[in-house]
Amino acid sequence: MGRALLLTLLAALAAAPLAAVWGISHAQVDDYLGPHRVRFASNFRGEVELNLGPIGNAYLASPVRPIGLSLTVGGVGSASENPDSLFSEQTLIAYTSLYTEPGEVLSGIVEGLVRDAVREGLKAEAVLLLGVALWRLRRRLVAPWIVTTVTRRRAAAVYVAVVALVVGSILVPPKPTDPRHPVSIAEGGQFSSLTVDSLLLANVLDRGIKGIKLLSARQQRAVKTYLDSATGSLSSQLGDLPKPGSGETMILGFSDLHCNRAMAELISRLAHATQPSIVLSSGDDTVNGTAAERGCIRREAAIPDEVPFLVATGNHDSDLTEAQMRTVGMTVLDGQVIDAAGLNVLGDDDPEHNIPFSVDRVKERPESEEEMAQRLVDVARNRHTDVLLVHQPVAARVIMDSPNLPVPLVLWGHYHAESGPAVIMHNDGSWTVGMQQGTAGGVHEPMITSFSTPFSPPLISADVYFYFRDDTTGLITGVQPVHFRPDATVVIEDRIATGDLAKLPLETRIKLGGASATPTVEASR
């Protein structure tokens, strides 16, 4: 038994180099860069190759030679595409992040390629081990003359020759035979080694990169100016910032951030100044839910000051977005009640997802918004729930219309417009507060025309909300919105009272955990 295990381990080690080569050379990921669908595939050609179809190919030295990367862009140069769209401001803006922070944008793609390479490598390892096992059984499976011919020494020699051939071809990749033309505008920058095999593409990229550089500089200046001005406005009102009263828990909530970099930073500064107990997002944290938006999720995850961050993802997010969120420590709600910061939070992701860079939606599961809402209500009736998060108002309407809903706070977004707080009174004198949160990213609708969202200041009011929960009864006694205007002024609204605890019936107060009347908490201003 011990000898068999040792032989298996030796076979696995011998097969590992070939399996690794197979895995790397066969890994691929389909995702988006800008508005175009792209297939990413790793190889050993030692360069990054961008295949733009009939327009030509672009080449860039790989930073991890001899491993290279092939990007095949779909739709470019097709008859259905307007050629002018290649130079439109919207398209250039969509690629700005690739120019300004290529490492951040591509890191999500690379993670996917690594996972696929591991999967392909494990498959190859299994096949090679099967081959070794069959070789060990060769005396039972093949003719004696073959056994005599294929000796261990000859098999080892073949293995060494194959490994040497493979390693040699990797370390000394073939030299390109096609013509290469430098792109002049890339000289001296991070794309200084960029070349193309088409004069047409050289002209396209000269124009495109020049446009991206101008747009990038303009947007970065605008974002910095907005950050500085909004921070100054916020700092001048430190005494008016939301803060909980005695016996209260303060919750920070927002929706539809849509990857806005300026607002992610400002909300982080606001959270640091106010110290909420928990942060909640009702979805649409990204623009398209692509791997390239990994940096957006990383920045958003830094918003809370070491407190729980829970999300009910929206129709612009994706399964990949949810995986990115979990990786950086955010909690993605999935229909189960989660205990966080002493609160029971319930929610689920949107059953509909947008196709990237499109207004079209596809169903991710056979469930309507209304059916999801009713399912969550049923869960809340059987498990104590303090907060219920969904993304779309269609679902929220079903929840808020449920008689005597046993949930003190319901939050949603999607419309990029604030509505509420709505207070629904129940038969026992308690209440539910519902809030349609605006857009924390200050984003115009429809999203299809807002490619610049991650790199621009808010285009409309960017909204953040603070909710005040009475620790004794669990009821929400107030809501305080904070608005970041497009002109960088910050408006801290007065606290809006949502219920009077002194009027709560004694039997309800006892049921909720308060044995005696609790005085109304006045707004702390």
Identify the meaning behind each predicted range:
Residues 272-274, 341-346, 352-431:
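His/acidic metal-ligating clusters that form di-metal
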Residues 146, 241, 254, 259-339:
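Core catalytic region of metal-dependent phosphoesterases/phosphodiesterases
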Residues 255-258, 283-285, 315-316, 349-351, ...:
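Active-site metal-binding loops of divalent metal-dependent hydrolases
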Residues 199-210, 242-251, 336-347, 352, ...:
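Beta-strand-turn-beta hairpins that frame and shape the catalytic cleft
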Residues 1-237, 504-525:
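Non-catalytic terminal accessory segments
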Residues 211-223, 248-263, 286-291, 354-367, ...:
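Acidic/histidine-rich helix-loop elements
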Residues 225-245, 257, 265-274, 323-326, ...:
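Extracytosolic and intramembrane catalytic regions of membrane-associated proteins
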Residues 301-303, 307-310, 392-521:
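Conserved beta-sheet core of the metallophosphoesterase superfamily
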